């Protein structure tokens, strides 16, 4: 565990996130070299994708109940304006463009996924017109937050919905569900040939045409325009700053974009990119394409995956439209059809609007994060044996998804002792360490004749080592630990824009600060046990650091107890871990400390009193203390010395 750190020592948390993104891309498809190896992994990877999208398990499909709310037409096409249900009391809106006159028999169809133009389908009407004039049925639908649809794609982007992290809700998943339901609507049309349906779009629509094709194999061919990049360049080149929250899943399984979109294989996939697009990097998308194409080569179908590059900014060019048209003609229509370029908008907003500014009532689309999230439930036990079994299952579920990186982590803690001195009757040992190039710090203070118990106090972001020493220090042995992202390596939340995008970038590599802190605390505990013969180690933390201490104790049952100071009463308010609320909330996490000692300082009121009821049921109410810090720590040390 000893030894000096490498020459990256003192790197920032941002630098660590960037290197993590690069490593994810570098390790893409590791261990996969044959079609058998890919097929053996494919179902697992698709399930992981759906879980990262918040769609595992899938919501129940309700009846679409489509309602026609008007129509309009032009030369060679007619358009039906439709409202339909995404979920009960949650409405979507769409335009169905049909050729006029309609050809005989069933027709190929295009699901056009809109990007981020403010008035949704209105701004993309040229695409519906073009496809209808080329003999395709084309359905355009409004995204969440666009047109007349309520809801939010920018909750994290603007820093107003950090609770999405703990809910495990990403607008990428909300929009994917919206896309699946739009596909349901398209396939419900009797004139559509279900075996000849393609998906396309630009920007956010380019990303979601890919996401939809991964999730739903009813999509038979894809043409994505300016939709994505490698994880390495999306994060490392700060493209996250320019992207909506709907552009990536919460990447807890650490998959490069190429690994996600290779799940489309062997269906036809066209990737189109503008050379001068400010939101992406040519080296990133080219590498992504080459990695995806290797999977197509394993299927013996490299011609089904193609990259089309063209000059210009983040937009279509005439040659892009031609390439996409030829792609779908080949793979859906089965024949080459006359080329028709994109024209101008032909209809005013007052004509194209589906809801005329007011969706049907009731409409709960603004509640989609809550409606789509299945909250975990933990029953109160009737005995300690029952609770021990329940904790085993909770640990399994925690390590399966929200905290799975912690179990798989290959990151190492290196420590170097840089100070050993006496201050009165106390010995001070100072350690400078690093994990993946980011500095960590540990100061250990022991009496002249140390006891067998140690309190390990963990810094919260915004705290200093000296501040925590002054708050926690006492007659007992204690150590103060500065994990990554706290103390001197903490990002500055007063720089609100960059702080938000750092948080979002971390999510794109599957991390939150609380998750990193849990990982680092467990490493520090192992170091202290290896270097010294502490009979028992207790944990103390304030705020999110207190939450991290609770989870560290939940995962390491040799931890003697926890004092959690000023922690939130629910993960909706803080201590964010991706998707943690699908397993449990903070009162249940506190319960996982039982039957060990738990001290709660400045713990806000909450109505269920779940943790107190648990300790009462287990007959150990004396091991739960709610009150001041000094007494909470003193009781913990006292119980430790009695062997409780």
Where are these regions (language model features)?
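Cap/lid segment of the alpha/beta-hydrolase catalytic domain
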Residues: 103-188, 194, 228-240, 246, ...
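Structural beta-sheet core signal
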Residues: 199, 271, 457, 480, ...
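Alpha-helix capping and helix-loop boundary segments enriched in small/acidic/polar residues
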Residues: 118-126, 163-177, 199-210, 247-260, ...
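Alpha/beta-hydrolase-fold catalytic nucleophile elbow
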Residues: 142, 200, 225-226, 272, ...
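Aromatic-residue-lined binding/catalytic grooves and analogous aromatic/hydrophobic interfacial grooves
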Residues: 99
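Alpha/beta-hydrolase-fold serine-hydrolase catalytic core, especially in secreted/extracellular enzymes
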Residues: 1-91, 102-105, 259, 265, ...
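Accessory cap/linker subdomain of secreted extracellular hydrolases
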Residues: 42, 145-149, 154-185, 202, ...
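Primarily recognizes the serine-hydrolase "nucleophile elbow" in alpha/beta-hydrolase
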Residues: 134, 182-253, 524-592
